[in-house]
A protein has these predicted regions:
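Conserved C-terminal structural/oligomerization subdomain of aldehyde/semialdehyde dehydrogenase
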Residues: 32, 112, 131, 138-252
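ALDH superfamily catalytic-core signature
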Residues: 2-148, 211
Length: 252
């Protein structure tokens, strides 16, 4: 498991000896929030992005919101961001810590700046460290609204506590935006309409789809499509990554 860049290098190095590789790489998950979603869907999705300081490959960093509740979703996301504390890991309490390195911190800062430069609305957070933290690789929980699909923050894996919120008109547009990415690890659906959820889940080009906050159980295969990797870990599918097929004739 690692970045898509690391996965490409591993694949190239394995090619000379024709080694098989199982890659679980980056992601740019979409979280499709319909007007009939449960009351906690928006806050749950935002917290999922900010958890682990955003350093999760399956984080739902693109929140797609049905237009009729877009303003409500934006306000809830801003509230969650403003109430998410950032502090050192040794401090007791409910807060998120720093990102892993200066390289990652600098990358996140550049991508936040790119969102500003490309015209997205910075609704919460922003560049530089949170107030009161003058050193360390701490990133402000950041919310961008009015994001366009062409922007870098909508396409590149940021791997930090940064969420982009985009509106959609109908199912078809939501599916199109969700699939318009080089990645395909995990997508999310929020709706009380089970038939709609099932219909959309079948059309999403990702290795995993989570519906209404129901996490995956132990033994389920974990992995993605496209530049999110190949192969699976977990359950019987994970074990099969280590097996070879053998054909034998004349056995009986």
């Amino acid at each position: 498991t690692g970045s898509t860049r690391a996965g490409k290098l591993i694949s190239k190095n394995a090619a000379d000896s024709i080694k098989r590789v199982c890659l679980e790489l980056g992601g740019k998950g979409a979280n499709i929030v319909f007007a009939d979603s449960d009351d906690k869907a928006i806050s749950r999705g935002v917290r999922r992005v900010f958890g682990n300081s955003g350093q999760s490959c399956n984080a739902p960093t693109r929140m797609l919101v049905e237009k009729s509740i877009y303003e409500k979703a934006v306000n809830e996301a801003i509230e969650v961001a403003n109430n998410t504390e950032v502090n050192i890991a040794s401090k007791k309490g409910n807060h998120i810590g720093p990102v892993v390195s200066k390289i990652q911190y600098d990358k996140i800062q550049k991508l936040i700046q790119s969102g500003i430069d490309e015209g997205a609305n910075l609704a919460a957070g922003g560049i530089d460290r949170p107030k009161g933290l003058d050193k360390g690789y701490f990133v402000q929980p950041t919310v961008f609204t009015d994001v366009k699909t062409s922007m870098r923050i909508a396409n590149e894996e940021i791997f930090g506590p940064v969420i982009s919120i985009l509106p959609f008109e109908n199912e078809e547009e939501a599916i199109s935006i969700s699939n318009d990415t080089a990645y395909g690890l995990t997508n999310y659906i929020q709706t009380k309409d089970k038939e709609k959820a099932h219909r959309i889940a079948k059309q999403l080009r990702s290795g995993m789809v989570e519906i209404n906050g129901n996490g995956f159980t132990g033994g389920t295969p974990f992995g993605g499509y496209k530049q999110s990797g190949n192969g699976r870990e977990g359950g019987s599918w994970g074990l099969e990554e280590y097996l070879e097929v053998k054909t034998i004739s004349g056995w009986s």
